[in-house]
């Protein structure tokens, strides 16, 4: 009997990956923003049409850093229909999650129900795109601007998705991407942040490296979330094939529908 897998990691050929990692033995640069890391970051910026991007070692730490870099306080309105990582990241930052119901058709947060939950303690909305379904980004943008709230997206499910000709990750203040092994694009484990404000780059660069600034100072405590060169090399290989992976998944969806 042939097994039909629910998920299966996409991988390049053994030969392609070996060829990609061979230069690591020449540079002996295994982590700390090495050549592969820089190459993948630039390639993803171009592919996703991103203004600014920061790579990290996994999607959860990306979300944790997104919340931290925005200096949030108090409450964050989010969805209960998400992976536990979303809520964990809120709590780990000393923030209180406030749950808003979802749209039963798209499974994304119901933008029409958010305003009733906003209080003087609310500092942000953390919305999650689900199963490739995009949140009501236009309503969410208006709400965030009206109440002066930060708008963060968990975009783990929407790699490469566009809305009205724009990358979904271009909406909001910052979007988190997951490059976990089960995602349509993976770096084995990995994640990234896409954002508009250029000044966040140096801040995130420090936050993903124990809080160490480019000058070598440590103005605040933080974590280690650096992507290593072997992860980046897998990403470089998989990015060459991601369009075909997306097409394969679209064909599966069409068959079920």
Where are these regions (language model features)?
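PLP-dependent aminotransferase-like
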Residues: 68-155, 162
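N-terminal "arm"/small-domain region of PLP-dependent enzymes with the aminotransferase-like
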Residues: 1-30
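Short loop/turn motifs at secondary-structure junctions
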Residues: 49, 72, 121, 170-171, ...
